[in-house]
A protein has these predicted regions:
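Perimembrane helix-loop-helix junctions
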Residues: 2-7, 179-211, 281-286, 331
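Specific aromatic-rich, kink-prone transmembrane helix
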Residues: 104, 124-127, 143-162, 166, ...
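Transmembrane-helix motifs of polytopic, lipid-linked glycan transferases
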Residues: 19, 23, 92-112
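Membrane-lumen/periplasm interface segments of specific transmembrane helices
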Residues: 28, 201-273, 302-309, 313, ...
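Short helix- or helix-capping micro-motifs
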Residues: 22-26, 118-129, 149, 153, ...
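Membrane-embedded, lumen/periplasm-facing catalytic core of multi-pass transferases
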Residues: 155, 347-413, 419-420
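Signature aromatic-anchored transmembrane alpha helix within multi-pass, membrane-resident enzymes
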Residues: 18-22, 165, 207-211, 265-271, ...
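Hydrophobic/aromatic-rich transmembrane helices and adjacent perimembrane loops
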Residues: 141, 170-173, 179-180, 258-269, ...
Length: 528
């Protein structure tokens, strides 16, 4: 397809595109809408919205104060208040943001290259595992990415002040969204050659407008809490401990992989590199178009800014932090295929298929459950375990770790009807199991689960493992069988799904709990 051909999508406005894209996204995510909340959703984002809805506090009271701006929590609180405290309500609300983001991706790509590349880019972005999963999760990263992509589109259209409004909304969704305006300000100041030096300074100053609402939020947070950022533990984990040159170097390597290789993105990166060896395809109207080089350089600068910022800051190397950059990578890749491959639709379709496969098949390296549909396995296993506890352990104190501690104490998260008394450990490593055994008299039941996905590395390096443990929280959970032997307990419920597992151990002598467990799942039954 060439851009000289008439395409009905050339005339589609935002008002016509957004409902169409939202309906498609909704249908793709329909099987996931009723899942209870997962990991950081349960640990912060939903409780923060709960606090805002019930105590009208912009700063979280009943959960960790991360210092994040309040727009994302306010958005969720609005939908919860209007439609009720149900996970499906939040997921549909997030799909609206995903549809908004994808609509801006389409309009941006159509303006820069044409409708054919716009369709390919939008479809590939929608099914790219990391973006797909985040589309229905309540993390602030999706809202920040949606407004950031809107701002980038308006910026490339020359609509300077509307773009700053979009970036301001992005910054009020999550403070790290300031990365893109800073990158564009740097572009205007150092690399944009049109206009005088004074003109470049003025444009750079305009690009820095989103700093103002961020400063206002930080001032409010300081006035309210006495801190500019989140609580001491959160700040230490995400900033103080991260400021290490060796950690930065190691994180930069992993961040580069996350952006250009993770979750089958390597296929598109390789295809893009291979296509560069071919000359541009020439038709009756000349060479096929490409994204203008200055715009590509702006995109590269935005990508580089994300890589550097999230290598320097942030305790966990979560791929969702790079969410605004992924559509830019995909757009450049699809544009390159379109420009240099005659029948470019075939490799573009292959990339989409490869991304879809990444949703269902785990990669042969370590990854987070939220990078593909493994998170669904995690949630479903935890839901089954919570229901077992409700049926058979109502009067017991439970030993477990986060996020199960929130799942079992906050009924609005969708796991339990009433809270359980808990004893908390950090994880289920050998060290924590020793602590658990020392606290043996304080609990009757242990609820264990996989806190990390342990995939055997391609090349085993003890030094690399030590560095991962030191800087990135890597650890190995003991198996349910080892934990049962160590804690002198009996496994009364055990379920697995690929790399994820949950186990419930009864600490007392054989009792009615063990006998009723046999009716529920069989003695030491494994549910696949």
């Amino acid at each position: 397809m060439t851009t000289s051909q008439t395409n009905p999508l050339d005339e589609f406005s935002f008002r016509r595109l957004f409902p169409l894209i939202f309906v498609i996204v909704f249908l793709l995510h329909a099987p996931l809408l009723r899942l209870p909340f997962f990991w950081d959703e349960a640990g912060f984002y939903v409780p923060a919205a709960y606090d805002l809805a019930h105590s009208h506090s912009l700063i979280a009271k009943t959960t960790l104060d991360t210092g994040h701006p309040p727009l994302s929590a306010a958005y969720l609180a609005f939908w919860f208040t209007v439609s009720g405290w149900n996970p499906a309500v939040a997921r549909v609300a997030m799909l609206l943001l995903a549809g908004f983001a994808l609509t801006n991706v389409f309009l941006l790509a159509r303006r820069l290259v044409g409708s054919g590349v716009a369709v390919a880019t939008t479809v590939a972005t929608a099914v790219f595992p990391i973006f797909f999963v985040q589309s229905s999760l309540t993390h602030a990263d999706l809202m920040a990415a949606a407004f950031t992509l809107w701002g980038i589109r308006l910026y490339t259209e020359g609509r300077v002040w509307p773009s700053q409004l979009a970036f301001c909304l992005a910054v009020l969704s999550k403070e790290t969204a300031i990365i893109t305006p800073l990158a564009l300000a740097l572009w205007e100041l150092l690399f944009h050659r049109n206009g005088s030096g004074r003109g470049r300074i003025e444009k750079a100053a305009i690009a820095l407008v989103p700093v103002l609402p961020l400063l206002a939020w930080l001032a409010y947070h300081y006035h309210t809490t006495g801190r500019f950022f989140g609580n001491a533990d959160f700040y230490q984990y995400n900033v103080t401990q991260a400021l290490n040159p060796l950690r930065f170097f190691l994180a930069l390597i992993q961040r580069t992989w996350h952006l250009f290789g993770a979750m089958n993105m390597l296929a598109l990166t390789a295809a893009t590199a291979a296509a560069m060896f071919f000359p541009p395809v020439t038709g009756s109207s000349g060479e096929r178009p490409r994204i203008a080089v200055p715009v590509q350089l702006q995109f590269v600068l935005v990508m580089l800014a994300h890589l550097l910022a999230f290598s320097l800051l942030g305790g966990a190397l979560l791929t969702r932090y790079l969410l605004p950059a992924y559509p830019l990578v995909i757009m450049i890749g699809m544009s390159t295929l379109h420009r240099r491959i005659s029948r470019w639709e075939w490799p573009a379709a292959l990339m989409v298929i490869v991304f879809v496969l990444g949703l269902f098949f785990d990669p042969p390296y370590r990854f987070a459950p939220e990078d593909n549909l493994t998170y669904k396995d995690f949630v479903e296993l935890h839901f089954k375990a919570a229901k077992f506890l409700e049926q058979h352990e109502q009067n017991s104190t439970i030993l477990t770790a986060w996020p199960a501690t929130d799942e079992l104490t906050r009924p609005y998260l969708g796991y339990v009807a009433q809270s359980f008394p808990l004893v908390q450990v950090q994880d289920f490593t050998v060290e924590q199991m020793i602590k658990a055994r020392q606290m043996r008299s304080k609990y009757q039941v242990a609820y264990l689960f996989s806190t990390k996905i342990d995939v055997p590395p391609w090349i085993r390096s003890e030094r690399w493992e030590k560095l991962n443990r030191r800087f990135f929280g890597s650890h190995v959970d003991v198996s349910p069988e080892v934990a049962a032997e160590f804690l002198h307990g009996k496994i009364v419920f055990l379920a697995r799904s690929k790399a994820e597992w949950v186990a419930i151990l009864e600490m007392d002598q054989p009792s009615s709990v063990a006998s009723t467990a046999q009716k529920f799942c069989g003695p030491q039954k494994t549910a696949d």
